[in-house]
């Protein structure tokens, strides 16, 4: 049996005091309700990599009523809460932090691209439903298991190998937005998409057609918020994901040079990058992608304004 890794010291050393204070209040609420509570998501991955949590998100999984636990948490901390009862999740905005409580669950997909059907589960099933092994680890938070790492699917090994790996062969057909996430994490972390996962991604690239434009727009927005989004866009172009947004899109040396100029001249933003990405499209093509991705009025205006600029 592998040796149990405990990250209690790393939590206390790596996270800022206000984050630790919020986690401890969540632990107290969970103990009062006798609910198993776990730290999950990118924060666990980044702790193991020794990297800062760049987005100020604290994600926790609860074996039980996550919304009820979030209500008790908010009574202690304040903040603005948004609950989604269908998935038994709650998001709390508090100062600079976003705290997510989610019921540990099992997900099933009736068809490719559909939103999942959710049933209560355990931390084991909850980790298995996640996108990649490096994001499928948890840290126990209840006092009896505080700091214990739950790595059931080889996440630590893939961190060491610098691999982005799916947990099962149907991952991309279940949720094709994972194709964009694989590319984004690969470029952000300096990893490589694991060879078998890469073959699955290429096989299932057309599954992006099963995903609504609104969800694809969200993934594109996340890419455009990266420090150097041209890297992920070039990889998406290479793997065919970019063309699933619109066949005329290209991420070539011209685009990379324009993104670099935007950063040097202080104009870099996700809106400006979107305008550059679509700059070589015709009016008809811009209308098509605007409708398909359901772009906001602000995004549509940025596209047209940036076409008139000299850069």
Question: How does the language model describe each region?
Answer:
Residues 1-311:
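Catalytic cores of the polymerase beta-like nucleotidyltransferase superfamily
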